[in-house]
């Protein structure tokens, strides 16, 4: 009996109430397994220019000049409205932000259960190489390299809000007039009949309001601890009464 009372008391002490509050938990899901759900992205943008170079062993009058190498991205500039009398294509104004062109990678891994699964490796490589205006001579004379040009241009699509200019249209000649658009006339109703009334909008009854449950406190589980504590108190009181009666009977 004493052991039962002690056990119930210990259980009631261990059952501390839980606090109810809003919380958020985040976890990586849908990729159970070892070494799974990995993503590796290595975008590389390496412009290489080699132009206007000379490699000579025995040569004379072998210059290299006036060569040009470029790796550029065309950027849109802010447009301005045209003046009076200009076309519609030149009078539209737009403002776009220039963005650099290059290699990029977008990827994700999801829903890959297993070992070593769900891996995503993306290696976009953008390597523009310019090789122009170069000479390699062993025995040469008067072998110049000049006036060459290498370019790698990346044009941007029209930005948001920009529209392509309309195709040119030929105006009518002198003295000619544009034909009027065709008109569609509805035939009149026959004699003796009345025109049908226009359809009236149907009256829609609003839906009945949905009853929402009132807010209530969360159940923290403290009711069980109160019952265990009450049972422990009853057992202790009964044990004390039985102990005193046993002492009284043994003394007679």
UniProtKB/Swiss-Prot annotation:
NCBIfam families for this protein: LPXTG_anchor (TIGR01167)
Membrane topology designation: Peptidoglycan-anchor
Q: Which family does it belong to?
A: Belongs to the chaplin family. Long chaplin subfamily.
Q: Which residues form the signal peptide?
A: 1-20
Motif: LPXTG sorting signal; annotated at 217-221
Q: Which UniProt keywords apply?
A: Amyloid, Cell adhesion, Cell wall, Peptidoglycan-anchor, Repeat, Secreted, Signal
Region of interest called Disordered, as start-end residue ranges on this chain: 71-121, 150-224
Q: Which domain of life is it from?
A: Bacteria
* Modification type Pentaglycyl murein peptidoglycan amidated threonine: residues: 220
Function of the molecule: One of 8 partially redundant surface-active proteins required for efficient formation of aerial mycelium; the short chaplins assemble into a hydrophobic, amyloidal fibrillar surface layer that envelopes and protects aerial hyphae and spores, presumably anchored to the long chaplins. Chaplins have an overlapping function with the surface-active SapB peptide; chaplins are essential on minimal medium while on rich medium both chaplins and SapB are required for efficient aerial hyphae formation.
Look up and give the organism this protein is from: Streptomyces coelicolor (strain ATCC BAA-471 / A3(2) / M145)
Compositionally skewed regions (Acidic residues) per UniProt: 153-165
Q: What happens biologically when this protein's gene is inactivated, per the record?
A: A single chpA disruption and double chpA-chpD knockout have no phenotype; a quadruple chpA-chpC-chpD-chpH knockout has delayed aerial hyphae formation and sporulation. A quintuple chpA-chpB-chpC-chpD-chpH knockout has a longer delay in aerial hyphae formation and an almost complete lack of sporulation. The quintuple knockout still expresses ChpE, ChpF and ChpG. Quintuple knockout chpA-chpB-chpC-chpD-chpH has strongly delayed aerial hyphae formation, makes many fewer aerial hyphae but no effect on viability of the spores produced.
| Positions with biased composition (Low complexity) | 86-108, 210-224
**Name of the protein:** Chaplin-A
| UniProt-listed Pfam families | ChpA-C
Which residues does the UniProt record annotate as the domain Chaplin?
Answer: 31-71, 112-152
* One annotated GO biological process: cell adhesion
Q: What is the lineage of its organism?
A: Bacteria, Bacillati, Actinomycetota, Actinomycetes, Kitasatosporales
